[in-house]
């Protein structure tokens, strides 16, 4: 099986890279092992919220020079040696909008998103259904009704309302009861956001839901709900807003996250619409190397039939997705045994304080400035690495996980397009 480009991993980075390549007419295949980290996403995407020394960042692009001094191995720092990062960021934003995603935010300045705990966190882009506020401004509501779903344990409205009250908001907490959900409620394992959304999205349930929300929010100017409506798109929520006559915003729930799934579905649909091939439920097990080039990939489902392409992209994720594997004494990349940025002594991998920066989160594949992975100190000629498999950054403490995924995806796609044009 032969393609122009094979991408290992179908998460945010892999899909974004595949979309950009397919938009330029490249025949791409994505080998995806299963559910990716987008199913755990809040629906907001971070670019850069904090520098490694702990300083908060309000304008991400203005902080890149300071970041390069503090963290030269950070993917942003490496990409800045080759191109202008602001161009990659702008293309990433445009790519998401071409996928049909209604997003708010800008790289010019972070904004605040409301979390399921009722606190605010800085971020770059958010789906339009998520409650947001200016970075240095007050929350834009005075009276808020936080409404949960009776029997739904993955969202606690009292916790959100209490946190909002601490911020000077007149917030109330309540639970709605909808008879249409009673069948799901009988089985707690079935009473999850995705299954609830399948019922709440039905047109026949819209009016009963609207009546219940109106009853519980009579004095509120805005309603906050758990993200349990609008499974595939926001149309059911828009229709509900029209009936209720008030703004309704969604807060992410415990996984699986409906907002994250919506991101994934939009990206995957765009990739396949452009002619890309997704191989779900498969995993690349090993690679065939000749003269520092990958000549074939062998996957679990295809056995001894190699997958061949002129260019390969490693977007296999971090520990969560098995893109990196940790044993008792080492961390390694399982397909090609690529060079890893890590620490030699296991005792140094983590800190006992759970909320302190954890060194292992910065572990990942080491690359050159073109994001070509190193193997024995030598860059592989036709392989690039993108997203969470990269080392040199802490996506949690620095608030840059999605930004690294999207910018590295666009960066590598543009390089591959240029290289293949020269080859032709």
From Swiss-Prot:
Pathway the protein contributes to: Polyol metabolism; glycerol degradation via glycerol kinase pathway; glycerone phosphate from sn-glycerol 3-phosphate (anaerobic route): step 1/1
EC number(s) recorded for this UniProt protein: 1.1.5.3
GO annotations of cellular component type: glycerol-3-phosphate dehydrogenase (FAD) complex
Keyword Oxidoreductase: yes
Keywords: Flavoprotein, FMN, Oxidoreductase
Required co-factors: FMN
Gene3D superfamilies in the cross-refs: FAD/NAD(P)-binding domain
Catalytic activity: a quinone + sn-glycerol 3-phosphate = dihydroxyacetone phosphate + a quinol
GO MF term set: glycerol-3-phosphate dehydrogenase (quinone) activity
Superkingdom of this protein's organism: Bacteria
GO biological process: glycerol catabolic process
Subunit description: Composed of a catalytic GlpA/B dimer and of membrane bound GlpC.
UniProt similarity note: Belongs to the anaerobic G-3-P dehydrogenase subunit B family.
Function according to Swiss-Prot or TrEMBL: Conversion of glycerol 3-phosphate to dihydroxyacetone. Uses fumarate or nitrate as electron acceptor.
Protein's name in the database: Anaerobic glycerol-3-phosphate dehydrogenase subunit B
Species annotation: Yersinia pseudotuberculosis serotype I (strain IP32953)
């Amino acid at each position: 099986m032969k393609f122009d480009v094979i991408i290992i991993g179908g998460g945010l980075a892999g899909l974004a890279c595949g979309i950009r390549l397919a938009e330029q007419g490249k025949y791409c295949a994505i080998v995806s092992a299963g559910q990716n980290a987008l199913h755990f996403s809040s629906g907001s995407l971070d670019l850069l919220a904090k520098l490694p020394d702990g300083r908060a960042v309000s304008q991400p692009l203005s902080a890149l020079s300071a970041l390069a001094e503090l963290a030269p191995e950070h993917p942003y720092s490496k990409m800045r040696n080759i191109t202008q990062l602001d161009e990659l960021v702008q293309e990433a934003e445009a790519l998401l909008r071409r996928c049909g995603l209604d997003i708010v935010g800008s790289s010019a300045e972070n904004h605040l998103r409301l979390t399921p705990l009722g606190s605010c966190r800085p971020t770059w882009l958010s789906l339009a259904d998520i409650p947001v506020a200016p970075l240095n401004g007050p929350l834009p509501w005075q009276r808020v009704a936080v409404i949960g779903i009776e029997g739904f344990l993955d969202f606690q409205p009292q916790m959100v309302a209490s946190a909002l009250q601490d911020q000077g908001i007149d917030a109330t907490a309540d639970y709605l009861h909808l008879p249409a959900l009673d069948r799901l409620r009988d089985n707690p394992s079935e009473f999850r956001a995705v299954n609830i959304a399948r019922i709440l999205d039905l047109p026949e349930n819209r009016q009963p839901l609207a009546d219940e929300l109106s009853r519980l929010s009579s004095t509120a100017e805005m309603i906050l709900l758990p993200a349990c409506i609008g499974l595939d798109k926001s149309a059911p929520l828009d229709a509900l807003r029209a009936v209720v006559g008030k703004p309704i915003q969604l807060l992410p729930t415990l996984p699986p996250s409906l907002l994250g799934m919506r991101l994934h579905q939009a990206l995957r649909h765009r990739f396949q619409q452009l002619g890309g091939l997704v191989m779900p439920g498969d995993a690349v097990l090993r690679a065939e190397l000749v003269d520092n080039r990958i000549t074939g990939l062998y996957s679990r489902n295809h056995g001894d039939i190699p997958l061949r392409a002129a260019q390969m992209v490693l977007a296999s994720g971090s520990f969560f997705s098995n893109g990196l594997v940790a044993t008792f004494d080492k961390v390694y990349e399982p397909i090609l045994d690529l060079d890893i940025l890590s620490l030699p002594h296991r005792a140094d991998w983590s800190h006992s304080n759970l909320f302190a920066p954890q060194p292992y989160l910065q572990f990942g594949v080491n690359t050159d400035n073109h994001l070509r992975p190193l193997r024995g100190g030598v860059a592989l000629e036709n392989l690039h690495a993108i997203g969470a498999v990269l080392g040199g950054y802490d996506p949690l403490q620095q608030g840059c996980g999605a930004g690294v995924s999207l910018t590295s995806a666009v960066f590598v796609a543009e390089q591959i397009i240029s290289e293949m044009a020269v080859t032709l």
